[in-house]
Every structure is written in C-alpha cells, then in structure tokens.
Amino acid sequence: MALLTHLLVCTFGMGSWVAINGLWVELPLLVTELPEGWYLPSYLTMVIQLANIGPLLVTLLHHFQPSCLSEVPIIFTVLAVGTVACALFAFLWNVTSWVLDGRHSIAFMVLTFFLALVDCTSSVTFLPFMSRLPACYLTTFFVGEGLSSLLPALVALAQGSGLTTCVNVTQPPDTTPSTATTGKTVFLQGANSTLGTDLTGTTRSAIHLESRYLPANFSPLVFFLLLSFMMACCLAAFFLLQRQPRPRESSIEDLLTSQVTLHSIRPREGDDLGPPDPGPSSKAQGLPEEKTASDHPAHLAFIYVLVAFVNALTNGVLPSVQTYSCLSYGPVAYHLSATLSSMANPLACFLSMFLPHRSLPFLGVLTVLGTGFGAYNMAMAVMSPCPLMQGHWAGEILIVASWVLFIGCLSYVKVMLGVILRDRSRSALVWCGAAVQLGSLLGALLMFPLVNVLRLFSSADFCSLQCSA
C-alpha cells in the first residue's frame, strides 16, 4: 500500500508543471512555425506570470476566509482544465489571427494562459494538500514535480524537436536570399560566404551556410496529445489518492494524540523524580532539533526569501535566456543542456530522500553555489553570439555542465526548504507556494523588458557565425 501511495503521489506531483514544461521543450519546433519567432520564450514568460492571479486569489482566500477554502475541489478543477487545454493545444497551436500590425498566435497565448493558471495555482494547492499525508511523501511529491520537466523533455528528444543542420544556400546576384540549397554540411569551415565568378570576372552568385531545421519525427499534434494524456494520468492519480482507505488527516492527528498521551503519562511517572525530563517528550514531538530552523521569525523570513529568490532564478530569469547562452555553442550543446538540466531536477529531488540536510547555512551556501553557475549562464547569454570558448569543445562542456549544476543545486534547495516548512504547518506550505509564484513573477518582470524592449541579447546562427579568436 505504501509503494502504491508513493507511485500515486509521484504521478500527482508530475501534474504540477508538466504542461508548461512541455511548452518549453517544444519551443525549438514552435518558433519555426509561429509568427513571434524567437521572441516567443519571453512572451510565454510574461503570459505565464499573468496567470499568477490564480495563486494570488487562493492565498488571499486562505488568509481572510480559511474556512471556505478546500484544496480538493480546486485541484480536481485545475487538473481537468489542464487536460482539456492540452487537448485543445493539439488542434489550435498554429492558428493565428491578424492583430494591429501583423499576425499573432492569439489562440496559442490564450491556451498558454489557462495552462499557466493550472500550473501556477498548483503551487498553492498541491503543497497544502500534501500536509494531509505523512512527511515521507513530500519528497516523493518533489520527485514527481521534477519528472514534470524530464518526461516532456524525453518526448521532445524522441520527437527530434528543433534539431538543425547547416546547408549551403545559393543567392543569385542582386536578389533576395534563396532557400534553394546546393549541398549539406554539419559544421562551418573558413568563411561563411563565397562568391562564384565566371571567366570575365562577373559575379554570378553567392554561397553561404545557413541553419535549417530537420523534420520532426512526429508533429506537435501528437506531442500535445501525449501531454494531455500525462495530465489525465495526474487527475486519475489524485482521484485514487482520495479513494485511499487511510484518512489523509490521520498522520497529523495520530501524532498529536501520541503527544497528548505522553504528556499525560509523564507527571505520574515522575512524581518522586522531580521535574520531568524533557528528553522523551521532545523526541515524541517529531525531532524538534530539525525544526528549529523554522521556529525563529528571522529564520522563517530567511526561508521565504530564499524560496522566492531560488524560484526567481529557475522559473523567471534564466529560462528567458537559455537559448542565447547555449545556441552559440551549437544545437548539440543546446539540446544537451535542456535535456540534462531537466534530468537534474528529479535526480536532485531523489537525492534529497537519502541525503537530507536541513541546515540553513548549508542551504544558503548551496544557493550561492547554484547562483554562481546561473551567473555564468547569464554571462554567456550577454556575450552571445560570441561567448567564451565558442567553437571549442571545452566551451560546450562548460555550458552544459553549468546548466545541469545550476538546476541541480537549486532544485535540492527547493526540496529541503519545502520539507522544513511542511514540518511547521499547513499554512506555511500555502505561503511557500505564494513565495514560489512571487519569485517567479519578479524574475519574469525583470527579464521581459531586457529581452524584448531593450534587446540586450543577440541570437546566433551557429552555421554562419564567425567570431574573432
């Protein structure tokens, strides 16, 4: 029964962000079809953050009307909406409308908003629901949350989403560039453009290398239907969790009952022994030495600030520039960084099950370390299209490793902070979810003008890129 519950909790946790993560990994294929092009990631970031109206409403209701708020119907609703929205995506993702000065993916943006509303609201409903289960299941929930990024990434990898190659493109003189190709290559040598001449010296045509996307193994329609199936599995898992014979609140009630019993017995045993020894009583309260990190108000404030900061980096700041930081090193580096960093998330959560460390100084140091890797990723994005060691194998290894370690370190921190707050109270988990969304919102609001308005980042075409040594 315990193994089945772990499996259900893991599947349930996967539903927290699987839909939005699926959109992100499908972006390399979507940007070639939608009119927004490579500005689509920053548009998505803003649309996703607008959906924070959902968690804001839930948090306000929890604060002012806690008695009228029940997570169960909200969770059923958001999972059902997510399943339907993913199914609609399969048929409407490429529908465009003429708005103001051009065509825009209005249907895509509207459906993205509903998916984001589902996933953002999960932060303030799924975690409080987990307080009804024994503490050992919370880490399993975070493993499932990590799988919400890994499984779509593996599907996108099987799809071949966004794989590119370099082709020779012939451009006749005094004409616009042609898409006709005269050959294919997989890397760039020498100059990126040559001119053909006849015997009289007249220029005939220009030949240069350009990136071309390879056909996907299956269409976005199939991909989004698979996403809808994943969401349906999450809905079924939550339904089965509700049908489990053991009441969800029993773990907490049993703990409180055992504490009352122990406290009521202690004075009788200690009538002739002086003041009661606090040792056994404190042990019965669930290892308070591990919970002291969240007992002091300053420590609690530090935890919430850390939650907001970590999620600002992982959900708002760095995702907006991943393409800029990786594509200059080539499509292989980009795909490895996206896929392996998605694998780092559940692996870090799984590691926390066997190597838990609740020390706030340790988590602070790990946050600084992860932030350092994030700073390297940001620096390479700023230096695009000619970052450090561009064109060298060491540069590719560094950028992939940096993204993996960035996600891995901060994912571990997020899990342990959630475990600390879970031991405090259900309300602490609600505010933890609010801090998650606040940090994500602030990160997105910071990056949107930098990417779309000021345009501080330059995209790179790996095939035609020439950087000075």
Swiss-Prot record:
It is a multi-pass membrane protein. Keywords: Cell membrane, Glycoprotein, Membrane, Phosphoprotein, Transmembrane, Transmembrane helix, Transport. Disulfide bonds: none annotated. The chain crosses the membrane at residues 7-27, 44-64, 72-92, 106-126, 138-158, 221-241, 298-318, 336-356, 362-382, 397-417, 428-448. GO terms for cellular component: plasma membrane. Glycans are attached at N94, N168. It is found in: Cell membrane. Residues 28-43, 93-105, 159-220, 319-335, 383-396, 449-469 are extracellular. The modification Phosphoserine is found at S251. Residues 1-6, 65-71, 127-137, 242-297, 357-361, 418-427 are cytoplasmic. One of its GO terms (biological process) is riboflavin transport. GO terms for molecular function: riboflavin transmembrane transporter activity. The keyword Transmembrane helix applies. It catalyses: riboflavin(in) = riboflavin(out). Its main location: membrane. Residues 266-290 are annotated as: Disordered. Plasma membrane transporter mediating the uptake by cells of the water soluble vitamin B2/riboflavin that plays a key role in biochemical oxidation-reduction reactions of the carbohydrate, lipid, and amino acid metabolism. Belongs to the riboflavin transporter family. This is Solute carrier family 52, riboflavin transporter, member 3. It comes from Ailuropoda melanoleuca (Giant panda). The gene is SLC52A3.
